[in-house]
A protein has these predicted regions:
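Exposed aromatic-hydrophobic patches
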Residues: 81-84, 117, 122, 136-149
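Gram-negative bacterial Sec-dependent N-terminal signal peptides
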Residues: 1-25
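Solvent-exposed serine/threonine-rich low-complexity stretches and specific carbohydrate-binding patches
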Residues: 122-134
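Short coil-to-beta strand junction motifs in C2/discoidin
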Residues: 103-110
Length: 247
């Protein structure tokens, strides 16, 4: 997709919110606002999708097999999930979680962020959503947080979730439940093999929208910015007429 001027400013954080475990990223030296690595999706195809609204009042959980939509574009495998989030509430923290299915399979998410005109603004590949070990209140999962600061005039942002042919060739090594239990109670960790989850086009994905930035750490230079402030994508002139998603 040919890069147009975007109207979204991005603040990026390498950590999660205080309420969830810290994430170790596989590769933090990438620039999310560089969307050239993302699949090229025609605007007309994006306009055919039904964008499910998600706000900070309640997380949205969707299953690819039942809630996914077809998007026949090179570089995208299987169905996609399409969400819209409010862009007029200040800085947004989007927590994306992909649950591991019975320790055998998992959906490896990629996320393309689009501004209110459906112009690509940021791309978060699957490496941005690393494996998280199970905890007291959480199961095995792939998870990451995307921190976005929409430019003035934005009303909505669009979140496209998909996987790729390359991701389907990979697997994720999990933590064996016996090891997790031993680790949790402080016992010696048994020397047993860990299960391996294959990557599939199906899975359960949860998207949470938050405006709580008390624990955020701005790390612009880590992602290729030359300053500590928010990374601005495109210009912040008055926006053109926004795309109106179908009701």
């Amino acid at each position: 997709m040919k890069m147009k001027k975007s109207l979204v400013a991005l603040c990026l954080s390498a950590g999660l919110l205080a309420s969830v475990p810290a994430v170790t990223f596989a590769d933090v030296n990438f620039v999310p606002q560089n969307t050239t690595a993302a699949p090229s999706v025609p605007t007309a195809a994006l306009q055919q999708l039904v964008w499910t609204p998600v706000d900070q009042s309640k997380p949205k959980t969707a299953q690819l097999a039942t809630g996914g939509q077809p998007l026949n574009v090179p570089g995208i495998s299987g169905p996609v999930l399409a969400f819209s989030v409010p862009a007029n509430i200040g800085e947004i923290a989007l927590t994306l979680t992909s649950e591991v299915n019975k320790q055998t399979s998992v959906f490896a998410p990629n996320v393309l962020i689009l501004d209110q005109n459906l112009t690509p603004a940021a791309f978060f590949p699957s490496d941005y959503f690393p494996y998280q070990e199970p905890g007291v209140m959480s199961a095995d999962r792939l998870e990451g947080v995307m921190r976005l600061t929409p430019a003035l005039g934005q009303q909505k942002l669009y979140v496209l979730v998909f996987t790729t042919p390359q991701d389907l060739q990979k697997t994720t090594t999990l933590l064996d439940p016996a090891k997790a239990y031993a680790k949790g109670i402080g016992n010696a960790i048994p020397d047993i093999p860990d299960p391996i989850a294959r990557h599939t086009t199906d899975g359960t994905v949860k998207l949470k929208v938050s405006t709580n930035t008390a624990s955020s750490v701005l790390v612009g230079p880590l992602f290729g910015s030359s300053s500590n402030g928010p990374v601005t994508v495109g210009n912040t002139a008055a926006p053109a007429t926004a795309y109106a998603a179908p009701a």
